[in-house]
Amino acid sequence: VPPREIVAIAQRRFTKPVELRRTHPHYENWKPSLYGPAFYETIYMAPSYQLGSLAQGSGGDWRGFSLQVTKNNDSINGLTVTAERPHVIAQSKNLLIWHGSETPQLSVPDAQVERIDGITFLTYDQTWIAVHPFDRGFALEIGDPQTHVGLVPFKRFVTARARLVVDAHRVQYRASNGSTLT
């Protein structure tokens, strides 16, 4: 029988939100050329959603991006990003930048969609997503009742305070709460 702490983690019985950063070994890690981590992963678990990413993006048989949103009826919706070419992902908590060599395709099932000042807002029951598109990617900021009280304040703060800066050498997103991701 595993320790109860391990069972609690497996059943996700812990205080949220929480951010996990972890690495994964190579599948053939006994080979000298495959020393060190194969993947650097960030997972952010909030009460109504889970955002996860791999720093080097998707490729082969792995997905480098995952966003699962819980609906009021306990079903789950997932936002999907599709791109054929290489890309990289930066994530910190509820913020994410997806940057590639082509414009990605986003699939957004069952969300209410609204565009304000070049920002696409996706609304689910208790989760709100601001998508800031740019030429070869996008920045995401995700809100929920814990971070922004409601949808109206979330939209107001994002449109008034958030900033996306894209230049030849970097992409930087300043979130509605002032935190930055580069």
What are these regions (language model features)?
Residues 1-182:
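Ser/Thr/Asn(+Pro)-rich, low-complexity disordered segments
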